[in-house]
Amino acid sequence: MREILHIQGGQCGNQIGSKFWEVICDEHGVDPTGRYKGTAAESDLQLERINVYFNEASGGRYVPRAVLMDLEPGTMDSIRSGPYGQIFRPDNLVFGQSGAGNNWAKGHYTEGAELIDAVLDVVRKEAENCDCLQGFQVCHSLGGGTGSGMGTLLISKVREEYPDRMMLTFSVFPSPKVSDTVVEPYNATLSVHQLVENADECMVLDNEALYDICFRTLKLTTPSFGDLNHLISATMSGVTCCLRFPGQLNSDLRKLAVNLIPLPRLHFFMVGFAPLTSRGSQQYISLTVPELTQQMWDAKNMMCAADPRHGRYLTASAMFRGKMSTKEVDEQMINVQNKNSSYFVEWIPNNVKSSVCDIPPTGLKMASTFVGNSTSIQEMFRRVSEQFTAMFRRKAFLHWYTGEGMDEMEFTEAESNMNDPVAEYQQYQDATADDEEEYDDEAADDHHQYES
């Protein structure tokens, strides 16, 4: 019931995804071979709704509802030889041999388009195995070729075939200071254009913000991608915990969307997770609802490089996990809104939703996941857009894209489409609750003029 189909694409998506499955297996007591290894006492909770993310195969093995795709075999090989490599259904690993070479056009139009049917077949097969499919979650990055180009191609195809199912993406944006590839701004801009149109909810992530959390908060001196991905997977597991474990106040992907998206195009969210503590200082932290709330709303805790203090929250959602009083949760949430009222738009009263799930993540007594729709996310788009314009003005690197059959017009279009959400976020950041009345008055005045 309420299954979620997980799709990961490209190197980044596959690495985040495989970490995520380690976390989910751990929470549900599934070992790397797919067998259930929990105790009888835990089994009620862990197995009751394990089918949100797992299929039960013959012999009691649990198989992830996951589709893995890439245009080169490298990452798949390392997943296969990794700790949880044997848990995936072998047919669900779909990969090409050529690679997309960080080129969005290859992922979207040429190489990716050749492989996409094979991926869609697997997606259909998995979707048919579901009782009542709730939606899809896609992990990908926007800077490369496969995750961005082929990832957005897949999202639009799946959208066509399952228009009424939720489409949730975990999208890793290019970082402001750290760049992996020169053509990131092109790939990201072309992708955002697709995400605005075809995704329902986008959780925006960013390596630099994750590095900062690892340095500052977790006190890791040399954080690896594994550490970053672990942070992401904690958040991913938190977003869906209410579907998988019993809770006092449940939420699901659709409730999340209904409560977070005031206008259809404004669906890019910042995410955070608490408690984040360095390995040595865990025993000194008292886990209380106020402490969690404080850390969760902290700007340093956001996993993308946009500062919520530079904008205002349109809406936000907090998912608490663990044994706690819902009354206390509600009080803390109201408290946050009252103390920082200038950071919330006034034309959406009570714009924070909270949900409570009784089962905490492994090894913690309490935890909370934060998802916020803040107008400051436009900083991310703006930054990418500036880098895009700088290169596009000189037509730098364009021949790689036109050589795959793209047209310059597409770039111009993507650029203006990138500026749409920015303008829209800005417009609603400045809007006040009584704006509407002024407009009505003006409209009425015009009306009188015409009549007279």
From Swiss-Prot:
SUPFAM superfamilies: Tubulin C-terminal domain-like, Tubulin nucleotide-binding domain-like. The gene is TUBB2. Residues 432-444 have a biased composition (Acidic residues). It is found in: Cytoplasm, Cytoskeleton. This is Tubulin beta-2 chain. Mg(2+) binds at residue 72. InterPro entries: Beta-tubulin_BS, Beta_tubulin, Tub_FtsZ_C, Tubulin, Tubulin/FtsZ-like_C, Tubulin/FtsZ_2-layer-sand-dom, Tubulin/FtsZ_GTPase_sf, Tubulin_C. GO terms for biological process: microtubule cytoskeleton organization; mitotic cell cycle. It comes from the Eukaryota.
